[in-house]
């Protein structure tokens, strides 16, 4: 039975092979005529059935409309391949998770804790300020000593030699004069005043610039980084020195130097229920020191939700920033720094945070923007950052992916690769160490070179992609004085007692901050993307264009495909036949007669005159042989012939 099936299958494939080898059996012209006569498209039928003039007209119309169809098809296909999206927006109110709230003091360390560590640096900055006097009464004697304060101060070269602070005198632009502020041998006198009383501030700022001298390769290559303000230059220089100093301090030591949660957070209330600093999670920020997160939602923590709008159903806090503990040369702003962010995401307070001013009540109403992007190929977003070729240095905090964490991690990788050390403000990669002036004397010029590099910035931006699902918090902020003049005495007494159980007033208007954070009447706005085009849209529009211009359908396309296949089939068979004939012509011998023998060749060479010309030879007809005429071959006996003798 199996053998019979195999034989039938073999015969079927043999017949199919013969049909393929034979081809459709038509010429190109016959196929085209058949197509025009049998297709469901209207135009081609007119080409073969109308008169000569109408044939030309219908032929032109058919070509024009066919061109329009193919053009529209191209536009539709390109639109589909562009993977466009449509955006939908919905606004409303519902019970939602309350955002995570990160609180920091704008000043990272208590001055009483770090004063011994920064004593020499602060004296250095104070001396530099005396040598750069910005006093309107003194008319800007920039290089004059203050004879009553630090005229005889000698600066320690070990602290400042790595990054000298200078003033550039550009009175003569072709020959600028550079004055080193920290040069102990320089002459500073009132006679060397760089600004006269008749000069205005604009002329002064254009002629004299405070700059940092950045040198590499053992001070053989130096550049000057200019600043428009001496205050800005000193603060930038102070931050660099501070980074180098605290890079040698372990994390536990830096945490002890900062503000404790019980000192920063005085009162807490959420949804009308009391809370305390114990409901906050500690995190260390390189810029603001100890920070505390409410409702972060890490593993094992329950997230809090809010079901009603208004301040009574939100978070209420009273903070004490202890402005008396501020570092004099580090932070020029007195405030609390806060940021609202998504649960389990790292708070980038410096980049995205806002300030809350002391002596005020700051109310923040929140609107949640939920963004949903389409994945590839509709966008280049990433789901969880696993496909990003940048190591997430913030993964140690068990936080989700964000574009800020990616950009900072990318910059830190470039810093380690180029400068051979890591920057103090970013997490430390494995196998690297933070930059210090003693171990890495060239790190500051390298750091500025990377920070100012457009190529590095664009490279990191191209590597880091936005998350497909993200949440942003739109805030409306209002402020009022708090407490009022009539209530401040008893409020400060109560807060001071609750803070340290003392009847002495330790809390005052310069350090107190009150915060109200709550949802608006409409607390969420969902912005989601969906595909603007799909396969159904593409097929529908392709068919619509074809039906409108040509009056055809999918069957017409199949018929056209059939005629194309038949034409290709005929072409292939013709090519194979041509190739076969060409091979046979190559195999055919050049001479039709058999080659001559050796004796014939010798005779033709010795007596060529006897050789006859085959072309002149006329063949002799061979006479035909008549058929035999025997009586024995006859079937019937022949009649006797009478002779004359008998007659």
Swiss-Prot record:
Protein name: Epithelial sodium channel subunit beta
Gene Ontology MF terms in the entry: ligand-gated sodium channel activity
Family assignment from sequence similarity: Belongs to the amiloride-sensitive sodium channel (TC 1.A.6) family. SCNN1B subfamily.
GO biological process, one term: multicellular organismal-level water homeostasis
Region Disordered, annotated ranges: 586-647
Coiled coil: none
Gene name of the encoded protein: scnn1b-a
Ranges of the Extracellular topological domain: 79-552
Principal location listed in the UniProt entry: membrane
Segments in the Cytoplasmic topological domain: 1-57, 574-647
Reaction it catalyzes: Na(+)(in) = Na(+)(out)
The keyword Disulfide bond belongs to this UniProt entry's keyword annotation: yes
Role summary: This is one of the three pore-forming subunits of the heterotrimeric epithelial sodium channel (ENaC), a critical regulator of sodium balance and fluid homeostasis. ENaC operates in epithelial tissues, where it mediates the electrodiffusion of sodium ions from extracellular fluid through the apical membrane of cells, with water following osmotically.
Short name of one Pfam family: ASC
Gene3D superfamilies: Acid-sensing ion channels like domains, YojJ-like
Disulfide bonds: 104-291, 215-222, 268-275, 381-468, 406-464, 410-460, 419-446, 421-435
Lineage: superkingdom: Eukaryota
Subunit comment: Component of the heterotrimeric epithelial sodium channel (ENaC) composed of an alpha/SCNN1A, a beta/SCNN1B and a gamma/SCNN1G subunit.
Record NCBIfam families: ENaC (TIGR00859)
Annotated transmembrane regions: 58-78, 553-573
Activity regulation (UniProt): Originally identified and characterized by its inhibition by the diuretic drug amiloride.
Location in or out of the cell: Apical cell membrane; Cytoplasmic vesicle membrane
GO CC annotations, alphabetized: apical plasma membrane; cytoplasmic vesicle membrane; plasma membrane; sodium channel complex
UniProt KW keywords: Cell membrane, Cytoplasmic vesicle, Disulfide bond, Ion channel, Ion transport, Membrane, Sodium, Sodium channel, Sodium transport, Transmembrane, Transmembrane helix, Transport
Topology of this chain in the membrane: Multi-pass membrane protein
């Amino acid at each position: 039975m199996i053998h019979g099936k195999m034989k039938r299958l073999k015969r079927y494939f043999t017949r199919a092979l013969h049909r393929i080898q034979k081809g459709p059996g038509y010429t190109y012209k016959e196929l085209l005529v058949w197509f025009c006569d049998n297709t469901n498209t209207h135009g081609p039928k007119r080409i073969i059935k109308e008169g000569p003039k109408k044939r030309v007209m219908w032929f032109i119309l058919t070509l024009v409309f066919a061109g329009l169809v193919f053009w529209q098809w191209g536009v539709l296909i390109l639109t589909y391949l562009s993977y466009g999206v449509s955006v939908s927006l919905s606004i409303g109110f519902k019970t939602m998770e309350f955002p995570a709230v990160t609180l920091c003091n704008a000043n990272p360390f208590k001055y009483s804790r770090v004063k011994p560590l920064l004593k020499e640096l602060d004296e250095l900055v104070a001396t530099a300020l005396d040598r750069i006097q910005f006093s309107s009464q003194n008319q800007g004697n920039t290089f004059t000593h203050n004879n009553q304060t630090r005229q005889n101060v000698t600066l320690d070269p070990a602290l400042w030699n790595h990054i000298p602070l200078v003033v550039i005198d550009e009175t003569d632009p072709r020959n600028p004069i550079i004055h080193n502020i920290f040069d102990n041998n320089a002459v500073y006198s009132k006679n060397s005043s760089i600004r006269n009383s008749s000069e205005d501030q604009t002329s002064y700022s254009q002629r004299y610039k405070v700059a940092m001298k950045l040198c590499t390769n053992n001070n053989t290559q130096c550049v000057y980084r200019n600043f428009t303000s001496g205050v800005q230059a000193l603060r930038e220089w102070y931050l660099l020195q501070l980074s180098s100093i605290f890079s040698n301090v372990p994390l536990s030591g830096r945490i002890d130097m900062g503000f404790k949660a019980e000192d920063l957070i005085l009162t807490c209330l959420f949804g009308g229920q009391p809370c305390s600093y114990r409901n906050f999670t500690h995190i260390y920020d390189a810029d603001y020191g100890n920070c505390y997160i409410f409702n972060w939602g890490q593993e094992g923590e329950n997230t809090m939700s809010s079901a009603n709008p208004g301040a009574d159903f939100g978070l209420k806090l009273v903070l004490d920033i202890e402005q008396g503990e501020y570092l004099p040369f580090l932070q020029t702003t007195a405030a609390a720094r806060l940021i609202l962010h998504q649960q389990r995401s790292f708070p980038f307070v410096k980049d995205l945070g806002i300030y809350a001013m002391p002596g005020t009540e700051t109310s923040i109403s929140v609107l949640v923007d939920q963004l949903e992007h389409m994945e590839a190929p509709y966008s280049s977003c990433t789901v969880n950052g696993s496909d990003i070729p940048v190591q997430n240095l913030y993964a140690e905090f068990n936080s989700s992916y964000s574009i800020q964490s990616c950009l900072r991690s990318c910059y830190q990788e470039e810093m380690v690769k180029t400068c051979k050390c890591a920057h103090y403000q970013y997490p430390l990669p494995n196998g690297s160490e933070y930059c210090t002036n003693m171990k890495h004397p060239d790190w500051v010029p390298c750091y500025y070179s990377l920070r100012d590099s457009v190529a590095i910035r664009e490279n990191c931006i191209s590597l880091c992609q936005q998350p497909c699902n993200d949440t942003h918090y739109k805030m409306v902020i209002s402020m009022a004085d708090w407490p009022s003049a009539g209530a401040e005495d008893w409020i400060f007494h109560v807060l001071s007692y609750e803070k340290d159980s003392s009847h002495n007033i330790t809390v005052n208007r310069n350090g107190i901050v009150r915060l109200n954070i709550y949802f608006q009447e409409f607390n969420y706005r969902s912005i989601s993307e969906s595909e603007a085009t799909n396969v159904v849209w593409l097929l529908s529009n392709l068919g619509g264009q074809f039906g409108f211009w040509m009056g055809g359908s999918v069957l017409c396309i199949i018929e056209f495909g059939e005629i194309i296949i038949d034409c290709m089939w005929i072409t292939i068979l013709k090519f194979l036949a041509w190739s076969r004939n060409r091979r046979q012509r190559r195999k055919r011998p050049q001479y039709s007669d058999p080659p001559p023998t050796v004796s014939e060749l010798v005779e033709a060479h010795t007596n060529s005159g006897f050789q006859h010309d085959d072309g002149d030879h006329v063949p002799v007809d061979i006479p035909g042989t008549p058929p035999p005429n025997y009586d024995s071959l006859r079937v019937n006996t022949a009649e006797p012939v009478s002779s004359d003798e008998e007659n």
